[in-house]
A protein has these predicted regions:
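Long, low-complexity, highly charged intrinsically disordered regions
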Residues: 1-30
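Eukaryotic alpha-helical solenoid repeat scaffolds
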Residues: 3-9, 88-90, 118-119
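Helix-loop junctions that connect tandem helical modules in alpha-solenoid scaffolds
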Residues: 20-25, 63-64, 109-113
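HEAT-repeat alpha-solenoid elements in large eukaryotic scaffold proteins
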Residues: 30-39
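Amphipathic protein-protein interaction modules
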Residues: 47-98
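Eukaryotic acidic, Ser/Thr-rich intrinsically disordered low-complexity regions
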Residues: 91-119
Length: 119
């Protein structure tokens, strides 16, 4: 899967992202695409829209598993790196729920990043 195919997949689970993807500079590379999707996930976390949030987390995992190397790097560099920041203000119970619902592939990438950084 390349970043153009990822956009189509993202729009299926987060139709609100369509508007952002209409701005062409946001569709030019994998990093911009994952940045838009990460912002959509952050909005869902703030709205506490658990059903759509879980669908989006699963879609992010699918992009991570099936995406080309650039998409995988973008997911690790943007989404995984942002997880702590976007869940920082959540109540502990809600934060735990989010991390429980993150698919295994993304959980492993998150743990690799946390342990690699020496934290």
């Amino acid at each position: 899967m390349n970043h153009i195919e990822a956009i189509q997949e993202i729009i299926k689970v987060a139709p609100e992202a369509t508007q952002e993807f209409e701005e062409t500079y946001k569709t030019q590379n994998s990093f911009m695409v994952i940045n838009v999707f990460t912002k959509q996930i952050q909005k869902l976390i703030l709205k506490k829209d658990k059903k759509v949030l879980i669908q989006c987390l699963n879609k992010m995992n699918e992009i991570y598993r099936k995406g080309d190397q650039t998409l995988k790097n973008a997911v690790e560099s943007i989404f995984i790196y942002s997880l702590d920041r976007i869940t920082f203000n959540c109540e502990n119970a809600y934060k735990n729920l989010i991390f429980e619902k993150i698919p295994l592939g993304l959980q492993k990438a998150y743990l690799r990043q946390v342990y690699k950084s020496g934290l």
